Amino acid sequence: MARVKRGVIARARHKKVLKAAKGYYGARSRVYRVAFQAVIKAGQYAYRDRRQRKRQFRQLWIARINAAARQNGLSYSKFINGLKKVSVEIDRKILADIAVFDKVAFAALVEKAKSAL
């Protein structure tokens, strides 16, 4: 059986990892062994943080809605409850956007929610 030399495959694999580690600090971008570990860890962080991003944005939207609702004399939970009672189906992302950029419209929503309570 013929001998298989794997230099080409190894070189390609190393190049792939070092390309992914481009921009990393020090040995992490130059030494294959260290770069491989850094790339694996980066992938784990990316996977985790894609899920956390959704939670963090929802937290941000809720904090903004709560702050705006309290300026209009209503807590977040009562505001959301009031909106559900008058069947206003606007998600938290849009509510937060309205709270930041259109205070008059948000105040109208708060009044609508107050009327249902």
Curated annotation (Swiss-Prot):
Pfam families: Ribosomal_L20. One of its GO terms (cellular component) is ribonucleoprotein complex. InterPro entries: Ribosomal_bL20, RIBOSOMAL_L20_CS, Ribosomal_protein_bL20_C. It comes from the Bacteria. Keywords: Ribonucleoprotein, Ribosomal protein, RNA-binding, rRNA-binding. One of its GO terms (molecular function) is structural constituent of ribosome. GO terms for biological process: ribosomal large subunit assembly; translation. Belongs to the bacterial ribosomal protein bL20 family. Binds directly to 23S ribosomal RNA and is necessary for the in vitro assembly process of the 50S ribosomal subunit. It is not involved in the protein synthesizing functions of that subunit. This is Large ribosomal subunit protein bL20. It comes from Actinobacillus pleuropneumoniae serotype 7 (strain AP76). The lineage of its organism: Bacteria, Pseudomonadati, Pseudomonadota, Gammaproteobacteria, Pasteurellales.
